[in-house]
């Protein structure tokens, strides 16, 4: 009933954030005459799941616009209509990614400027707000403050693990109003899991054989186990070792990582869901991609040490519907020989912060309400973690060899002005604005490319058919474009170093602009492979 414009919805994973926030958005938009409801999620998997859920709730596909890179239209007229709609976000309900939304605020490009108008006087729902990149924290805070204080927009921040953006030393978020009251009041109602510290204290973590035994022991007891690790290499290695143990047993083993194309992952998730529902014995080894936008429920989850937000997200895949009374989530340390995160600074800082939480929890569990998923635990974790990441929160970039922050470029541009020569300063002294808007827009990117190369894989007959069109020198440009759109779900991003390592296993088509992976370098189990699969070719 209130017109406050900044809200926080804190409810446990699986407690219905999407429909609750949508219901609020519809009511609020009608009561206060808001122009749009914009639903923003950080991951494509969440968009895929929740866009369909929103459509079912609304009963009208025509008023829901999805804007992300995976939307494919084969009909040229439909494609043109879609491009016009996404240029302006001219639909009552927009479902989009954090990348598209943040680009609208900060990136260069005519389309982004046009969409800026549409986010004013709207209801904006940010799902899984804790997953936003740390580097944009202060820019995000200031933009939300602007939208709510001056843009007549209402913003809802949804998360099971709300980050303390309103408690930073500077450039903090304005204090949000809690939509669901005190989380403690309903925490017990939704409590379906218990997080258990199995990190072995100050030890170096499980070696490969120890971890396999730990997983097997839980599988023998609980029958359906999900294991989530931090690296693709660890997931593949662990999968291959567990596969040996499963030989001759009635366990069904699955692997999930971004080494697999999106269509492959969809197929695996579908088979996983069927086997879990049919009470089959299941072990799934996955990277963190399974932690969001995946409606699966295992009897037990084993999570490699990570941030508490990741651990609680993983716990959301355990006993999801309360069918097992209480589900158990084990946090384990893994040796650096099996899971090397030395070059993954973000994960290391998460692990360091979580280790401090676990150490304090062992000493005095009462201050955490005897639960690692309590509000006290989440708060303590973020106090440590955000303090470690504070220097990164203003979006550090290098412009013409000068280290500067995007926050500075968009405010006083002090660093750039100080680096100018005296003659340049003299020529520019009469400028009305000192902000470097164009430079900031040009360098802004939510997720850096990091030298990733897209490679098309020959996963199934549909992919083969489209690749054949790309290889056909007599195919028209329109046919090539349509084939490329249809091949989006069959694309895997790999590093340039990995591409070079694969050598002749990758060929190029369309004048060298599209890379295609050889069939025998793509496994039906684990995706892109460093080595040829021998006789394990894909058979159609």
Model feature map: region roles:
Residues 65-77, 230-233, 253-269, 285-291:
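Conserved helicase motor
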Residues 160-218:
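Interdomain hinge/linker at the junction between the two RecA-like core domains of SF2 helicases
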Residues 3-25:
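Walker A/P-loop
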Residues 104, 282-298, 313-321:
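SF2 helicase motor core recognition
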Residues 34-57, 71, 164:
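Conserved Walker A/P-loop ATP-binding site and its immediately adjacent core
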Residues 60-106:
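Inter-Walker segment of RecA-like/P-loop motor cores
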Residues 148, 209-216, 220-224, 228, ...:
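C-terminal helicase lobe and adjacent C-terminal extensions/tails of nucleic-acid helicase motors
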């Amino acid at each position: 009933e209130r017109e406050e414009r900044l809200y926080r919805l804190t409810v446990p994973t699986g407690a219905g954030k999407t429909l609750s926030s949508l219901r609020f958005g519809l009511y609020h938009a009608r009561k206060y005459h808001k122009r749009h409801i914009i639903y923003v999620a950080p991951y494509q998997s969440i968009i895929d799941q929740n866009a369909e859920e929103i459509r079912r709730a609304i009963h009208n596909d025509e008023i829901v616009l999805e804007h992300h890179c995976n939307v494919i239209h084969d009909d040229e007229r439909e494609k043109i209509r879609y491009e016009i709609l996404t240029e302006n976000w001219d639909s009552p309900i927009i479902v989009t990614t954090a990348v598209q939304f943040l680009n609208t605020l900060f990136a260069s490009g005519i389309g982004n400027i046009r969409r800026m108008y549409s986010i004013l006087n709207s209801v904006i729902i940010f799902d899984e707000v804790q997953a936003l990149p740390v580097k944009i924290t202060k820019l995000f805070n200031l933009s939300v403050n602007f939208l709510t204080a001056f843009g007549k927009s209402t913003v809802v921040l949804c998360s099971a693990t709300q980050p303390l953006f309103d408690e930073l030393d500077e450039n903090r978020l304005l204090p949000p109003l809690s939509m669901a009251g005190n989380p403690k009041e309903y925490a017990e109602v939704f409590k379906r899991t218990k997080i258990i510290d199995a990190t072995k204290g100050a030890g170096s973590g499980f070696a490969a054989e120890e971890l396999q035994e730990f997983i097997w022991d839980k599988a023998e007891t609980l029958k359906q186990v999900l294991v989530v690790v931090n690296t693709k290499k660890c997931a593949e290695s662990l999968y291959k070792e567990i596969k040996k143990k499963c030989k001759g047993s009635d366990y069904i083993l699955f692997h999930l990582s971004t080494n697999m194309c999106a269509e492959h992952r969809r197929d695996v998730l579908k088979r996983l869901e069927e086997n879990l529902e049919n009470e089959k014995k299941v072990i799934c080894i996955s990277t963190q991609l399974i932690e969001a936008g995946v409606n699966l429920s295992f009897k037990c989850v084993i999570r490699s040490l990570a941030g508490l937000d990741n651990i609680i997200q993983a716990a959301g895949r355990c006993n999801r519907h309360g069918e097992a009374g209480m589900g158990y989530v084990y946090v384990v340390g893994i040796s650096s020989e099996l899971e090397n995160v030395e070059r993954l600074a973000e994960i290391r800082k998460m692990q360091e912060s979580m280790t401090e939480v676990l150490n304090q929890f062992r000493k005095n569990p009462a201050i955490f309400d005897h639960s690692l998923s309590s509000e006290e635990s989440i708060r303590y974790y973020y106090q440590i973690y955000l303090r470690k990441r504070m220097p990164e929160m203003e979006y550090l970039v290098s412009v013409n060899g000068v280290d500067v922050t995007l926050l500075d470029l968009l405010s006083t541009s002090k660093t750039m002005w100080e680096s100018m020569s005296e003659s340049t300063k003299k020529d520019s002294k009469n400028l009305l604005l000192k902000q470097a808007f164009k430079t900031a827009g040009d360098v802004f990117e939510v997720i850096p490319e990091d030298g990733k190369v897209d490679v098309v894989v020959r996963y199934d007959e549909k992919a083969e058919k489209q690749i054949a069109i790309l290889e056909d020198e007599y195919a028209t440009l329109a046919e090539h474009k349509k084939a490329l759109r249809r091949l989006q779900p069959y694309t895997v991003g790999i590093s340039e170093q990995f591409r070079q390592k694969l050598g002749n296993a990758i060929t190029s088509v369309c004048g060298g602009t599209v890379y295609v992976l050889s069939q025998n370098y793509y496994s039906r189990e684990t995706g892109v492979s460093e080595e040829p699969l021998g006789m394990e070719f894909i058979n159609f």
